[in-house]
């Protein structure tokens, strides 16, 4: 059953979920259908833009890899194959009902305000759980590891919900996605550090501020043209190649926000229906709809910094001690890795870029450390790409929640108790903080 659900893909499954949620919240059925399908149209459009980005940026990325002389032997296979690997494991087979029931239990007990409908991305929790299982040899510890990751993700979603809503321009949503949520503590820490630096304190340099100060220089189209030119020159392209990249990157800068607007347009009646429903039946209790990080990609800072990080990532990969991962399949979608930095830093370009470099260092190192386990998962799952190189990994598995949970639980029963205790403490602390606000 769950295999069939996953086979529908996000562009079909998410709209169906949205229609069902709309009907639960007493939205007229035709309006619920239109809302769900509109969300689906937005995701289809965004998928097309992502495919265009991958098709256009992959060739110059490969040229840059050759020019930088990268000789790394752990290959990044990307988030798509990684999700398949996650769901092909023993924990992946049970992850949807386990995490869904956890979410419902936390909602009922008021330990979270988020209902995570982004079920497709439960694979992040499956990867964490399976790494724990491979480290410890215990399926039970693995399931506990996945539950810990999911619980932390839900609380990070609650914690950042208002900032996400401000960036996206839509009330009643949050981001519990397994990777995005795991980057939140680091970005919050870095934001506090930036506030201690004199020339960064109290300043917010986003695309709108640049446009206000320097006119058309801050326009997304112009930013896209400049970034495309940088890509072309870095890849040694001639006039034709540079011109093509300039137009393509400018298109990405413009089309991503347009697709996000479609998703937001579809979510508006559902969000409004949810608000009215909970005001009427639950005395105004606030509940968020948990979505994929994709809904944050419309911000110019996320797109611009994400694209800038592509050549930076290749340089980092070549000089970072301990890194063995060759960034490849996940590289064209680099904006996904720093979308929560944009949220935490309120769209500030400089802060988001610095934080992006720092978080990608952690991503490379964790992806390197997880490579043996990820390769073993892929081989056991019968994935053919696992036999094409000595080891494989994915940048998208390099998240800090997965790493910290697996490291603790690898210590055995004491580590498991400590990990569960820390997660429970974080959940209760953030809940107490919410009640005091």
UniProtKB/Swiss-Prot annotation:
User: A GO term (biological process) for this protein?
Assistant: carbohydrate transport
The subcellular location is: Cell inner membrane
A GO MF label: galactitol transmembrane transporter activity
Sorted keywords for this record are: Cell inner membrane, Cell membrane, Membrane, Phosphotransferase system, Sugar transport, Transmembrane, Transmembrane helix, Transport
Ranges of residues in domain PTS EIIC type-2: 2-437
Q: How does it sit in the membrane?
A: Multi-pass membrane protein
Q: What is its main location?
A: membrane
Pfam families listed in its UniProt record: EIIC-GAT (PF03611)
Function in brief: The phosphoenolpyruvate-dependent sugar phosphotransferase system (PTS), a major carbohydrate active -transport system, catalyzes the phosphorylation of incoming sugar substrates concomitant with their translocation across the cell membrane.
Domain annotation text? The EIIC domain forms the PTS system translocation channel and contains the specific substrate-binding site.
What name is this protein filed under?
Putative permease IIC component
- Protein source organism: Escherichia coli (strain K12)
């Amino acid at each position: 059953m769950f295999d069939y659900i996953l086979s529908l893909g996000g562009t079909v499954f998410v709209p169906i979920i949205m229609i069902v949620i709309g009907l639960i919240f007493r939205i007229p059925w035709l309006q619920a259908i239109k809302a769900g399908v509109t969300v689906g149209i937005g995701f289809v459009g965004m998928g097309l833009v992502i495919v265009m980005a991958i098709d256009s940026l992959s060739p110059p990325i490969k040229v840059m890899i050759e020019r930088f002389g990268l000789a790394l032997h752990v290959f990044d296979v990307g988030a798509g194959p990684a999700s398949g690997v996650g769901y092909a494991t023993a924990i992946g087979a049970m992850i949807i009902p386990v995490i869904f029931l956890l979410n419902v239990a936390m909602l009922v007990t008021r330990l979270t305000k988020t209902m995570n409908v982004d079920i497709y991305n439960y694979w992040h929790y499956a990867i964490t759980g399976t790494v724990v299982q491979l480290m410890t040899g215990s399926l039970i510890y693995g399931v506990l590891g996945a539950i810990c990751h999911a619980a932390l993700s839900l609380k990070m979603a609650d914690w950042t919900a208002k900032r996400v809503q401000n960036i996206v321009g839509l009330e009643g949503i949050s981001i519990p996605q397994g990777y995005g949520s795991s980057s939140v503590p680091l970005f919050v820490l870095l934001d506090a550090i930036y506030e201690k630096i004199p020339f960064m304190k109290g300043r917010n340099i986003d695309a709108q501020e640049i446009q206000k100060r320097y006119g058309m220089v801050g326009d997304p189209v112009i930013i896209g043209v400049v970034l495309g030119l940088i890509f072309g020159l870095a890849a040694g392209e001639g006039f034709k190649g540079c011109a093509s990249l300039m137009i393509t990157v400018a298109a990405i800068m413009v089309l991503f926000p347009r697709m996000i607007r479609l998703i937001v347009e579809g979510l508006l009646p559902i969000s409004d229906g949810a608000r009215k429903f909970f005001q009427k039946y639950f005395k105004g209790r606030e509940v968020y709809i948990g979505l994929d990080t994709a809904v944050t990609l419309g911000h110019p800072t996320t797109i611009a910094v994400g694209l800038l990080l592509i050549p930076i990532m290749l340089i980092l990969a070549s000089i970072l001690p301990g890194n063995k991962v060759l960034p490849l399949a996940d590289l064209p979608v680099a904006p996904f890795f720093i979308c929560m930095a944009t949220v935490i830093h309120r769209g500030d370009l400089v802060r988001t870029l610095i934080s992006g470099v720092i978080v990608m260092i952690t991503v490379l190192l964790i992806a390197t450390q997880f490579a043996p386990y990820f390769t073993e998962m892929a081989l056991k799952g019968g994935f053919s790409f696992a036999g094409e190189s000595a080891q494989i990994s994915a940048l998208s598995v390099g998240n800090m929640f997965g790493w910290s949970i697996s490291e603790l639980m690898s210590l055995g029963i004491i580590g498991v108790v400590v990990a569960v205790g820390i997660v429970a403490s974080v959940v209760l602390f953030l809940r107490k903080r919410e009640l005091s606000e």
